[in-house]
């Protein structure tokens, strides 16, 4: 659907305030109903029965925020307008107020078209910082005059058109009793199987990506356990020594399934492409960070589908089941009696001096305070300390080829970072939730950019029930001396071989990245030094040429180039 849907709420109070008018710009056809004195407007294909039977309560709204339905949901009563986008949909809520009308959408570009499309240089500059904390980047809009709400935030607009955001932290009920662990594993297993079954309930054909890793393999074994026929796809590794290939072959042979192979990820990568149009002309809402696998995705999308198809991926598995950077911080709080021994072991294992490791483990800095300190360190030193146990693991630093003006612009934010609340008080759970939201956004981008392929990309590890079940498990379930992802192993025990979890090595793809940059080196320098970002004053061409003149490019610079290429390409496609 194009155009806008218009709604209003006229108060019956004696003061007769003006009608509050809102418009949902773009998106799907919508339906409006009433529950008591409340107007409820939702996407037509996602009828919300929870709000039909009775006037919506705050609890009902909070429950809906944590689902994965797409689209803007609006509710209006005498107190004003409430709008939100379910967090796990992978979409975000954007809004603007124009001529006393509240414009809402999951597309910032649609609103920008209504209020005047001007790129926001501050947001673009911040987007160039690949290590920028997600708590900041999720609240940025690439268009001037358009505001963004982070996932798990509800927008409230009153009759005076004053807008404010209400955070709604996701509910995670941790299992504290050891006797309840087996029950928790059973619940995780049930949630995983139900998530897969829900996704294959239609008559659509099913394909499953097998990369050689644990998560994609788990998808395949769950599909087999549900007696659903499916095909297997994978991209060959560039090197014959890459063990992912060997493990993928073992899994496919064990399942006795037809395999569809594609060229290696590196040979079809768009990681260092700053000029190509997007597939089918579908420009994403924000620059993509998966351009290294875009060629593989395009190959999958080009397959001729007579019928709809479901494509399973392993996105989200690492966040749910792996040992995340802040795990040691969480463990010393989960097992306080063992914390001295764990603290010493952590410092020894990672070769960190006790005088630095112990304060990091004991640190109780709040999330908003941490974000403020990050920005102060960036302003003063151009980088932050490399603390793996902080809310945002690792160092945050300005890219080496970023202009001085861009550095200044990136720190001028339209909100107070000190007031941002964490998604969970536990740092590991918070890190997992933030990263999972990023994976949900990738899945949404895949589906938005390739609708012509009639393929729906999905992952059971991004199902809200699976997320709640996995993150409720004790943190110590993420560690095991001999197994990868021991929590997932326990949930899959009985229909997935133990050997897959006992794998001691991971695939190596660094050489593919170096091959790709060597292939595109000269062209990329020209595209970036004389491109849109340089015209906007966000990239320093002299610094770029100096770095490119070096014979060997560092891995850090390669990551910078991937980010610069993604943003440059996006800007060229929207201008």
Language model features with spans:
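Cysteine-centered catalytic environments shared across enzyme families
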Residues: 1-270
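Adenosyl-5′-phosphate
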Residues: 1-20, 146, 306, 312, ...
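Active-site-proximal helix-loop elements at catalytic-domain edges
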Residues: 53-57, 171-175, 179-180, 277-283, ...
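Short loop/turn hinge sites at secondary-structure boundaries
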Residues: 60, 64, 130-134, 281-285, ...
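Short, motif-level signal for alpha-helix interfacial/capping segments enriched in acidic residues
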Residues: 67-70, 293-295, 438-444
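ATP-dependent adenylate-handling active sites, centered on carboxylate activation for C-N bond formation
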Residues: 79-82, 90, 172-408, 448-495, ...
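Alpha-helix boundary/capping detector
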Residues: 109, 121-125, 130-141, 218, ...
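Low-complexity, flexible helical/coil segments
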Residues: 110, 119-122, 137-140, 244-245, ...
């Amino acid at each position: 659907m194009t155009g806008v849907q218009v709604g209003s709420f006229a108060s019956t109070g004696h003061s007769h305030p003006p009608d509050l008018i809102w418009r949902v710009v773009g998106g799907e056809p919508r339906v409006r109903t009433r529950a008591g004195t409340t107007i409820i407007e939702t996407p037509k294909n996602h009828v919300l029965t929870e709000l039909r039977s009775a006037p919506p309560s705050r609890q009902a709204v909070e429950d809906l925020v944590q689902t994965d339905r797409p689209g803007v949901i609006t509710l209006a009563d005498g107190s004003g307008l409430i709008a939100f986008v379910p967090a796990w949909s992978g979409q975000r809520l954007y809004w603007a107020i124009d001529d006393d009308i509240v414009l809402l959408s999951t597309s910032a570009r649609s609103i920008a078209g209504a209020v005047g499309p001007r790129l926001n240089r501050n947001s673009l500059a911040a987007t160039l910082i690949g290590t920028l904390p997600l708590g900041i980047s999720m609240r940025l809009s690439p268009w001037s005059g358009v505001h963004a709400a982070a996932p798990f935030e509800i927008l409230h607009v009153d009759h005076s058109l004053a807008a404010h955001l209400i955070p709604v932290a996701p509910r995670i009920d941790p299992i504290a009793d050891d006797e309840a662990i087996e029950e928790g594993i059973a619940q995780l297993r049930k949630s995983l199987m139900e998530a897969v079954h829900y996704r294959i309930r239609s008559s659509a054909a099913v394909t499953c990506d097998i990369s050689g890793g644990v998560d994609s393999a788990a998808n395949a074994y769950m599909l087999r356990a549900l007696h659903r026929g499916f095909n297997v796809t994978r991209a060959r590794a560039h090197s014959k020594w890459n063990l992912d290939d060997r493990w993928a072959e073992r899994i496919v042979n064990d399942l006795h399934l037809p395999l569809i192979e594609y060229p290696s990820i590196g040979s079809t990568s768009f990681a260092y492409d700053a000029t190509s149009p997007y597939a089918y002309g579908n420009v994403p809402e924000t620059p993509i960070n998966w351009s290294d696998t875009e060629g593989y995705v395009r190959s999958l999308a080009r397959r001729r589908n007579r019928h709809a198809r479901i494509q399973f991926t392993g996105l989200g598995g690492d966040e749910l089941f792996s040992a995340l950077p802040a795990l040691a911080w969480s463990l010393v709080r989960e097992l306080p009696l063992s914390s001295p021994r764990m603290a010493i072991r952590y410092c020894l294992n990672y070769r960190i001096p006790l005088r630095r490791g112990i304060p990091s483990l004991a640190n109780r800095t709040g999330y908003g305070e941490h974000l403020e300190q990050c920005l102060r360190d960036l302003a003063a030193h151009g980088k932050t300390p490399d603390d793996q146990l902080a809310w945002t693991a690792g160092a945050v630093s300005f890219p080496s080829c970023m202009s001085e003006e861009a550095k200044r612009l990136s720190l001028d934010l339209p909100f107070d970072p000190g007031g941002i609340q964490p998604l969970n008080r536990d740092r590991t759970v918070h890190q997992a939730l933030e990263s999972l939201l990023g994976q949900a956004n990738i899945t949404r981008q895949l589906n938005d950019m390739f609708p012509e392929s009639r393929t729906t990309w999905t992952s059971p590890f991004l199902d809200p029930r699976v997320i709640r079940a996995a993150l409720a498990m004790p943190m110590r379930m993420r560690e095991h001396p001999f197994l990868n992802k021991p929590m997932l192993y326990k949930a899959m025990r009985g229909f997935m071989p133990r050997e897959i979890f006992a794998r001691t090595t991971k695939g190596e793809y660094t050489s593919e990245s170096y091959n790709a940059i060597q292939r595109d080196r000269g062209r990329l320098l020209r595209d970036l030094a004389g491109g849109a970002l340089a015209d906007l004053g966000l990239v320093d061409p002299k610094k770029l040429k100096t770095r490119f003149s070096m014979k060997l490019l560092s891995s850090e610079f390669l990551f910078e180039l991937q980010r610069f290429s993604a943003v440059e390409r996006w800007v060229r496609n929207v201008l």
